[in-house]
Amino acid sequence: MIGACGWQHPRWLEEFYPEDLPAEWQLGYYGNEYRVVLIPAEYWQDVDLSVETWLEETDNSPLFLSEWPQDRVAGERARAGMHELGARGLGFVISLTQMPAEAEIGIYKELAGGHALVFDIGELSAQAQESALGLLTQALGENRFGICWHGEPQGQAHLALGPLALTRISAVKDHKELRRIIQTILEQSNHHRKMVLIVDGDPPDIQLLQNAGIMLDLL
């Protein structure tokens, strides 16, 4: 599945959404084009956010992944929202900038009871990444979580981990690099796992999204 990080992007009014499309229809329009979306952590800061409205605005697409907010109140809102999304909620993406504390591990254990978890450890040093993998495996269990891949050749083994494999990119050098990334994802695909490619950016590059979709169809 291919999608973007977020759908509320003002610049998409020129690049993706029709200019006269009401803001409340943007998610439905997006869902007609892409099967999955990553909810940015900051969306959960909005006290007026309504998951019920998201479901009313869309049919069966998109499915939802969510970044895990660091703020406690936003985190509780995200947890409740993912529960409300039901079968359309795929799980949480948790970014680690340092080794998680015992309290954080406790939260991850609770989340893992009902949701797929993918950890982004790209900001950690190589040594810290190995330590984090060991700690998470001890806490959550072998192959019970995924590790986000960013398209770099040396990290592709992470795609084999967990029930949900996530790749996040914001740009590629050329079509050859995009083909390599998508082929690598497909090589790890099977009927028992969900494979997701998310395009990041401010806003995410619509041309890259479209090219990725075309490339996936060709492969």
Protein language model features and the residues they cover:
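Residues lining hydrophobic/aromatic ligand-binding pockets adjacent to catalytic sites
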Residues: M1-L219
